[in-house]
Amino acid sequence: MELTLNSSSSLIKRKDAKSSRNQESSSNNMTFAKMKPPTYQFQAKNSVKEMKFTHEKTFTPEGETLEKWEKLHVLSYPHSKNDASVPVFVMLPLDTVTMSGHLNKPRAMNASLMALKGAGVEGVMVDAWWGLVEKDGPMNYNWEGYAELIQMVQKHGLKLQVVMSFHQCGGNVGDSCSIPLPPWVLEEISKNPDLVYTDKSGRRNPEYISLGCDSVPVLRGRTPIQVYSDFMRSFRERFEGYIGGVIAEIQVGMGPCGELRYPSYPESNGTWRFPGIGEFQCYDKYMKSSLQAYAESIGKTNWGTSGPHDAGEYKNLPEDTEFFRRDGTWNSEYGKFFMEWYSGKLLEHGDQLLSSAKGIFQGSGAKLSGKVAGIHWHYNTRSHAAELTAGYYNTRNHDGYLPIAKMFNKHGVVLNFTCMEMKDGEQPEHANCSPEGLVKQVQNATRQAGTELAGENALERYDSSAFGQVVATNRSDSGNGLTAFTYLRMNKRLFEGQNWQQLVEFVKNMKEGGHGRRLSKEDTTGSDLYVGFVKGKIAENVEEAALV
C-alpha cells in the first residue's frame, strides 16, 4: 500500500516498486552487514548539489574559505531565514529499539510511518541509546535495530533525526521505559561513585556521567569525551552512505534528557517536584577539585571548599533561601564567582562535545544540533533560581543564553529549544513562570549570535492552543524563526481522530509559515493533504499504527 503526497518536499523516488513491496514484509529478526549507500535518485530542485546557504550570518572557521564551508555543511532539509516554511518531525517512542537490539513492533512502526508520510511530516526522530548500542562491552557496538529503522524510514521517503543519547532513560518527565547506562559503565560507577553528579547531601544521580571527569581516563582507559566520540565515529562508519541523505540530522546529547544542563531537578523517587528550584550538582570529587582550582586562580581559596551553603533544597521556592531570594547571595561577589564557574564548566562540556562531533560528521551533509532545556519556572523572579541550578547563568542582570548560542554557532550547530508550545497564562501564579518570555529571550540570543534555532514541545499536547502557540512563535518578529520543529511524541493517542486532525493542520500551517488555514474536508488542489484523505488512510491502518 502506498501513500502519495503530491505536494511533498520529499527528495526520494523509488526506482524499484517491486523491491519496495518485498521490504514491507521485512522480518524483525533481520541482520544487516555494513549498510550500502541508498539506491534512490534525487530529483528535487533543492538537492544537495544545488542547495545554497542563504543565512544572513555564517560562521566560517579560521583557515576555511566560505565556499569550502558551504560544501561541508550543506543543509539537509530546505529552510533558510528567508523561507517561512518549517519542516515538522515527530519523535518516535523511547523504546523504538528493544533491549535485545531489534526494532520494536516493526509492523506497527511501518503503518505509523506510512501515516506520518501521508500527514506531510518531514521525518521522525529516534534516540540512539548508549545503554543499548554499547551495552555488551567497550567499543562493542550493535546498530542492528537502527539499521532496520533506517531502511524502513527510507522506504517511506521520510528523513531521520538521530539523537546520540549518552544519558539514562527513566526518571524524568515523559519517560515511559528504563534504559540505564551500559552495564560496564555502571560497573565503573559502582567502583567510583564520583563518576556521576552529586548534590550537597551526597545523593548520586546515575543519569549521566559528571562533566567534571570529561578529560580523565575513568572509563577503562578512555575519557568520557573519548567514549562519546568513539560512539559517534562508529555511527558514522556504519551508516556512511545514509548520513546526509535519509539521516538528515545528528543531535548530540550533552546531559540528562539529552540536554546541555545539570540534572538539577530529578523526578525519580520524588526528589524534586515542580516548581522547586532544584539543587546545584557540583559535589563529586572531580567538580570539587575544579571549583577549588578556580577559586585559587583568582586568590579566593576559601570560596573553593564547597558550593553555596544557603541555596536550599530541591522543592524550595526562591524566597525560602538566602541564596535565591530577591536580594540574595546570587547577586553578591561570591554568587557571581560561583555561577561563572558552574555555568562555565557546562559551556566547556558542550564545547568539547560539539567540537568532537563536528570533526566526526563534517562533510557528511547532515545537520548537527544540540538541545537546551526550557526551564521557565521562576523566570519572572530576579534570580531565575531553577535556571541557575541547571547551569544557565541567567538572571535579571546577566544573559545566560547568549554565551550558549555563541558556542553553538562557533561549531555551526543548530540550537534546539523546548517549551515552544507553552503560554504564560497556562502556568500557576506561584511558580512565576514565563515560557513565552524565555522563548523570546532565546530567539533574540540565537539571532544575535547568528545561530539557527529549532524547537520542540516540552510536554505531550494535542490541543489547538499548543499547536497555535508554536505557529505564533515561529512567525514572531522578536527573533529567529524556526528551522525545524520536532513534535513530542508518536504514541497511541496521536492517532486518535481529533488529535490526528490537529497534527495534520499544524504540519500544513508550519509548511505555510503559519499562514495556513484549517484543512478542508475536500481536496480541491490535488495535494492529498486534506482531512478526509488522511482519515481514510488512517482508518485502514489504525490498529497497526497505534503504538502503545
From Swiss-Prot:
Keywords: Carbohydrate metabolism, Chloroplast, Glycosidase, Hydrolase, Plastid, Polysaccharide degradation, Transit peptide. Gene3D superfamilies: Glycosidases. Its main location: plastid. It holds the Pfam family Glyco_hydro_14. One of its GO terms (molecular function) is beta-amylase activity. It catalyses: Hydrolysis of (1->4)-alpha-D-glucosidic linkages in polysaccharides so as to remove successive maltose units from the non-reducing ends of the chains. One of its GO terms (cellular component) is chloroplast stroma. The keyword Chloroplast applies. Residues 1-49 form a transit peptide. Its EC number is 3.2.1.2. It is an enzyme of class 3 (hydrolase). Belongs to the glycosyl hydrolase 14 family. This is Beta-amylase 3, chloroplastic. The lineage of its organism: Eukaryota, Viridiplantae, Streptophyta, Embryophyta, Tracheophyta.
